[in-house]
């Protein structure tokens, strides 16, 4: 197998390996999980438990519209039950906005908050019915506040205030507390993201990435816990923190409660006052931050605001929200390679203002950097190709005696100073980089809805006319003629079939990924032709001298 086929084979093999657990391991539907999971009580924190997936109480809906989102806030709990992203089209119908939060019979993904205190069980939770002055709100300036008022809680007055900002997916959630009671109040607030285990809208078999909760702290960094581990009561993550964020991640989009914004102070007053809690209860997965508020003396008031980010995983946005939030972009285990490649892709996009041409320039840059290794590989393959006739003669000479044939071949390699692995090793060094580039493109929401040329209006979707996959197949097939033929007839036949077999997978890949592979193959062929010509020229010069 020549080195180019080896690269493609390893790339696809690793891709299949990464997706194995997600595609072929048993999945738990919310109903199955509900049947087998015993709900934990959380009595230690006295935190209200999530409702059953089919029993989220519905009240009146408050409509909110900004330049970027359409939101629905339910008067029950003041929960954010629906959130549509107006600048991002739905996976199946791009004319409709993508819906991140949803509370319907088929899907549950909401943001909940509440207050609890042992001394005052009447504090508002996600089950309390709030009131609002208006049924709908429209952002007309730079900010918009939506105030919900809770019933009196033994003399304690509580308001829950949402703050929407222009040109922002960040939503402020503030509790205003006035203690009109006779006793001090020490409330704990919970900020929860609640969702079922279903794959997100538009999740494809060829573009499957992580879906589930994650936490980040300055001490323990980025940690993910799968839905399966939550259902089994497993998962290792930071339980206490003084900063960081807790999130629900999926392909291209995320939501997160931020305890310490990048440009602000932490809401945690000491190392024990903030806790993360990830669990599965009654068919729903919960990712929550618990925050102990400062004690509110009688006659005093307190206001605490925690930002909620709910939007795309765009690097230029999330990297400015909180420390470590750039890790939310799922580059897999090849983050160390994918992250700098994505950074370079963003810089190139800044030059050409087109993600398609940025991919072309990125491929050119990567090929230029690795040209010395590629040249060494092709020179080694050219030597192997020159020895092909002698290999055939050795095979005819030794017949079925494979032992003598192999000995003769190794002796020939030694005499001609040829390393049979010389064509593979330089390419093997590049494989992590190419896989990193694969993940950089796969995880980039920036490509979603991004046009290139002609009919390529969305580089995150497959080529609608399959032109790029066909070109991909053609380039792979043509490359077989530029490489030395394998001595084994069966292997030679496989080399003809493999391009067609692998190319079938590219029909389902996002167009941006296929564009990268097409450009990479064309450049590889051009490099190989150029290097072969150089070798032929040097060989002729050596003969003439």
Swiss-Prot record:
Record GO terms (molecular function): membrane insertase activity
Pfam families the record matches: 60KD_IMP (PF02096), YidC_periplas (PF14849)
Compartment list: Cell inner membrane
GO-annotated cellular components: plasma membrane
Membrane topology value: Multi-pass membrane protein
Keyword Amino-acid biosynthesis set for record: no
One record GO biological process: protein transport
Transmembrane segments: 6-26, 331-351, 355-375, 425-445, 467-487, 499-519
Keyword list, A-Z: Cell inner membrane, Cell membrane, Chaperone, Membrane, Protein transport, Transmembrane, Transmembrane helix, Transport
Domain of life: Bacteria
InterPro entries per record: Membr_insert_YidC (IPR019998), Membr_insert_YidC_N (IPR028053), YidC/ALB3/OXA1/COX18 (IPR001708), YidC/Oxa/ALB_C (IPR028055), YidC_ALB_C (IPR047196), YidC_periplasmic_sf (IPR038221)
CDD domains given in the database record: 5TM_YidC_Alb3, EcYidC-like_peri
PANTHER family reported in the protein's UniProt record: CYTOCHROME C OXIDASE ASSEMBLY PROTEIN COX18, MITOCHONDRIAL (PTHR12428:SF65), OXA1 (PTHR12428)
Function description: Required for the insertion and/or proper folding and/or complex formation of integral membrane proteins into the membrane. Involved in integration of membrane proteins that insert both dependently and independently of the Sec translocase complex, as well as at least some lipoproteins. Aids folding of multispanning membrane proteins.
Family, similarity comment: Belongs to the OXA1/ALB3/YidC family. Type 1 subfamily.
Subunit details: Interacts with the Sec translocase complex via SecD. Specifically interacts with transmembrane segments of nascent integral membrane proteins during membrane integration.
Protein name: Membrane protein insertase YidC
């Amino acid at each position: 197998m020549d080195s180019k086929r080896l690269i493609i084979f390893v790339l696809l093999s690793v891709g299949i390996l990464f997706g194995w657990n997600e595609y072929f391991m048993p999945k738990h539907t919310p109903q199955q999980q509900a049947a087998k999971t015993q709900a934990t009580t959380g009595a230690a924190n006295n935190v209200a438990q999530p409702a059953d997936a089919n029993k989220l109480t519905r009240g009146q809906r408050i409509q909110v519209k900004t330049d970027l989102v359409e939101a629905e806030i339910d008067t029950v709990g003041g929960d954010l039950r629906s959130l549509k992203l107006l600048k991002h089209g739905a996976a199946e119908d791009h004319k409709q906005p993508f819906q991140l939060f949803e509370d319907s019979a088929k899907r549950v993904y909401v943001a909940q908050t509440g207050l609890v205190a042992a001394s005052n069980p009447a504090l508002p939770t996600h089950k309390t019915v709030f009131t609002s002055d208006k049924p709908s709100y429209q952002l007309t300036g730079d900010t918009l506040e939506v105030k919900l008022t809770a019933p009196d809680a033994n003399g304690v007055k509580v308001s829950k205030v949402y703050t929407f900002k222009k040109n922002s997916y960040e939503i402020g959630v503030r509790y205003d507390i006035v203690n009109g009671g006779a006793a001090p109040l020490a409330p704990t607030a919970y900020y929860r993201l609640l969702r079922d285990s279903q794959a997100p809208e538009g999740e494809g078999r060829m573009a499957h990435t992580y879906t589930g909760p994650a936490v980040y702290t300055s001490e323990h960094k980025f940690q993910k816990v799968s839905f399966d581990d939550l259902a089994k009561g497993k998962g290792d993550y930071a339980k206490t923190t003084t900063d960081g964020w807790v999130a629900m991640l999926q392909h291209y989009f995320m939501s997160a409660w931020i305890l310490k914004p990048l440009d602000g102070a932490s809401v945690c007053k000491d190392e024990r006052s903030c806790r993360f809690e990830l669990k599965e209860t009654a068919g729903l997965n919960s990712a929550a931050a618990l925050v102990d508020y400062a004690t509110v003396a009688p006659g005093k008031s307190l206001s605490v605001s925690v930002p909620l980010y709910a939007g795309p995983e765009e690097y230029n946005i999330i990297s400015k929200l909180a420390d470590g939030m750039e890790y939310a972009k799922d580059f897999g285990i090849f983050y160390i390679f994918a992250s700098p490649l994505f950074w370079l892709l963003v810089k190139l996009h800044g030059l050409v203002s087109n993600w398609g041409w940025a991919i072309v320039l990125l491929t050119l840059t990567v090929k230029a950097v690795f040209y010395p290794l590629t040249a060494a590989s092709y020179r080694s393959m050219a030597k192997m190709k020159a020895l092909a006739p002698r290999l055939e003669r050795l095979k005819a000479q030794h017949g079925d005696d494979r032992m003598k044939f192999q000995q003769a071949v190794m002796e020939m390699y030694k005499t001609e100073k040829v390393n049979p692995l010389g064509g593979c090793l330089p390419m093997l060094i590049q494989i992590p980089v190419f896989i990193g580039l694969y993940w950089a493109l796969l995880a980039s929401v920036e490509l979603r809805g991004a046009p290139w040329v002609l009919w390529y209006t969305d580089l995150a979707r497959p080529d609608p006319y399959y032109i790029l996959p066909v070109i991909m197949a053609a380039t792979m097939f043509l490359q077989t003629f530029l490489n030395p033929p394998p001595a084994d007839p069966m292997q030679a036949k496989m080399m003809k079939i493999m391009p067609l077999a692998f190319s079938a997978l590219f029909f389902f890949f996002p167009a941006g990924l296929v564009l990268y592979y097409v450009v990479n193959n064309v450049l590889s062929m051009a490099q190989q032709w150029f290097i072969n010509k150089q070798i032929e020229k040097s060989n002729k010069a050596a003969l003439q001298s």
